[in-house]
Amino acid sequence: PLGLLVGHQSLEAWGWRGAFLVYGVLELGLALPLLAWLFREPAPGAGVAAGTAVAETALSGSSAPQAWRSASFWLVLGNQVLAVFVMSGIMTHGVPMLVERGLSRGEAGTALSALWVGMMLSQPLMGWLLDRVATPRVALPFALAAVLGMAWFLVGDTPSSLWLAVFLVGLGGGGESGTTKYLLMRYFGLRSFGVIYGSIQPFTFALSISLGTYLLGWLYDRAEGYGTAEWVLLAAFSLAACSLFAFRPYPQKLP
């Protein structure tokens, strides 16, 4: 939300070049010092016992080829591709979509900030549920919240109703798209986790993000409005929610 506010004010004051410059200065002057301060390598010899324990348990699980031949892998991938596709599209086109709904640019920026509020709340809430509910369908309430939010977006016409719609999209989509690592670990273990997770990244980040941005723009140009694009986003969220019913229970014992 703060980034959106800073970006909007910078855009109004100095144009898009000035806004990018402000973001660059903040990245260099704020983010990098925080990284240097908060993230440090442990002292030599620290955590040897813990590292040994991890090494012993890391051998359990599927190999990468075994995971790729599993239906569970492709279900996780498909679910995440759909969720990230919608979220990236809204992040990129959210302000003009809201302006088309009748909001001013300032109101649209404020409403879109609800997306990040929902995403921030979704992560600890989803983590809390994952620790207590041993089923991949634990993400279903979040998926349904995202569907409800997108449907509400289609009919909302006031700043408050659109803020709530965007909040539900952020809460649901953020929770659903934040389960990738956990689901892969539960289905396939830690034996080849890096390779398995890395093989999903090109689809969820490269394909979904670029496709979400491009396709919404293409649909806008063809339809001269975002109406068709919004229905596509609703369909994608709905398909992602339905895919959760096909997820198998976690294996009782990993290979």
Placement of each model-derived feature along the sequence:
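Small-residue-rich segments within alpha-helical transmembrane domains of MFS-like 12-TM solute carriers
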Residues: P1, V84, S88, G170-G178, ...
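Interfacial helix-cap and linker-helix signal at transmembrane-aqueous boundaries
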Residues: L4-W14, L98-V99, L129-L130, L215-E224
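Symmetry-related core transmembrane helices of the 12-TM Major Facilitator Superfamily/SLC fold
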Residues: G18-W37, A229-A246
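Residue-level signature of the transmembrane alpha-helical cores
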Residues: Y23-L26, N79, A139-G149, A165, ...
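Flexible cytoplasmic inter-helical loops of multi-pass small-molecule transporters
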Residues: F39-S62, L254-P255
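Extracytoplasmic gate region of multi-pass secondary transporters
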Residues: P65-P124, G212
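C-terminal transmembrane helical hairpin of 12-TM major facilitator-type secondary transporters
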Residues: L112-L183
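A late C-terminal transmembrane helix in Major Facilitator Superfamily
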Residues: Y187-A223
